[in-house]
Amino acid sequence: MMSVLKKICGSKNSLKSFDNEVYQSIEKELQRQKSQLQLIASENFASKAVMEAQGSFLTNKYAEGYPGKRYYCGCEHVDKIESLAIERLCKLFGVKFANVQPHSGSQANQAVFASLLTPGDTILGLSLSCGGHLTHGAAPSLSGKWFKSIQYTVNKDTYLLNMDEIEKLALEHKPKLIIAGASAYPRKMDFKRFREIADKVGAYLLADIAHYAGLIAAGEYPSPAEYAHVMTSTTHKTLRGPRGGIVMTNDEALHKKIQSAVFPGLQGGPLMHVIAAKAVAFKEALAPEFKTYSKKVVENAKVLAQELQKHGLDIITGGTDSHIVLVDLRSQKLTGKDVVDSLERAGITCNKNSVPFDTAKPTITSGLRFGTAAETTRGLEAENFKEIAGLINEVIQGLISGNSSSVEKAVKAKVERICSNFPIY
């Protein structure tokens, strides 16, 4: 007897034959990724092994609960997979306990809030305009609505975190939770000092390492594992895995609270196909090659920042310690929106980004955020990033001179040449 799936999709059961519209859009996206330079700091190229796991039959399996304690039968194989993911993650970051079920970094943060806070509690996080994340207490986020959010900023001259000011705010407002983390801060964070401040006011310290996780795992960025009460992260970005979230801690009591907060507090059934992909990505990150890769990510970012500076562009904090490079366009009299649109037409994708104390709207901005993780995965070296810096400058100068159309066309041809020399998939 023919199965229902075969009746619906045909005997070949392929996406192309059943839904060519979706298939063509996926193919076009693949071609876009192949032919453009991806410099968005939160993006990377997952391996075929990661994507194979995520596209597996595990998408069919429902598995509410945790390994050995499921609410459904038939979970022996997914139990093994989730246990592997947890074991590998703990080894990767040197922690005792981990939850791999959060669907995203935002939900991982929400799980921590649900574990440690009650509505109305005070939290202290980095201002969105100075590089923080929405979930760190920004007004539009639930974290800014449920809790009394106090925001720390950066030094107005150096754009570096002012730890003395953070301590002053903590002593004044007595937060229950301090968040150390960012979505657009290129420099190292002093997690030891953050913990000292937290201890002075009896606060928990959450280290949101979503952007830096892969670099931390490889020893290329300071680890907060020794200092933070709890760590959260995404699993893509510099970890180069599937899109998802994780929570880690060395405190068993906190771990139990987090387990309950994730399930049944915030989520129902976990995405077992994504957890399998996470497990594969963690194994990749444990390999020696990942350390070499992460070292190159930071080296390439430093080169990109230095070369952009040579072209006369202002770099926030004067450089980078991570994969992130932030450009301040205010001296160029250009907006982030205008530049990213022009860069995209030239085959370079990045994102417009607010700079510290920006007066432009978030939909316009006065800056750019670049990241080197994806193109380093592709195989680009320092010399390639020197060339890319030149291409970025060409596009910016084209906007300034009013000759953007011809410049974009010329740069796009150069971008496609670079991409053809470094194929993906």
Curated annotation (Swiss-Prot):
GO cellular component terms listed in the entry, alphabetical order: cytosol
Catalytic activity: (6R)-5,10-methylene-5,6,7,8-tetrahydrofolate + glycine + H2O = (6S)-5,6,7,8-tetrahydrofolate + L-serine
InterPro entries assigned to the protein according to its UniProt record, in alphabetical order: PyrdxlP-dep_Trfase (IPR015424), PyrdxlP-dep_Trfase_major (IPR015421), PyrdxlP-dep_Trfase_small (IPR015422), Ser_HO-MeTrfase (IPR001085), Ser_HO-MeTrfase-like (IPR049943), Ser_HO-MeTrfase_PLP_BS (IPR019798), SHMT-like_dom (IPR039429)
Any single Pfam family the record assigns to this protein: SHMT
Gene Ontology MF terms in the entry: glycine hydroxymethyltransferase activity; pyridoxal phosphate binding
Enzyme Commission code: 2.1.2.1
Pathway it works in: One-carbon metabolism; tetrahydrofolate interconversion; Amino-acid biosynthesis; glycine biosynthesis; glycine from L-serine: step 1/1
Class of enzymatic activity (EC top level): transferase
PANTHER family in alphabetical order: SERINE HYDROXYMETHYLTRANSFERASE, SERINE HYDROXYMETHYLTRANSFERASE 1
Known function: Catalyzes the reversible interconversion of serine and glycine with tetrahydrofolate (THF) serving as the one-carbon carrier. This reaction serves as the major source of one-carbon groups required for the biosynthesis of purines, thymidylate, methionine, and other important biomolecules. Also exhibits THF-independent aldolase activity toward beta-hydroxyamino acids, producing glycine and aldehydes, via a retro-aldol mechanism.
Protein name: Serine hydroxymethyltransferase
Lineage, broadest ranks: Bacteria, Pseudomonadati, Pseudomonadota, Alphaproteobacteria, Rickettsiales
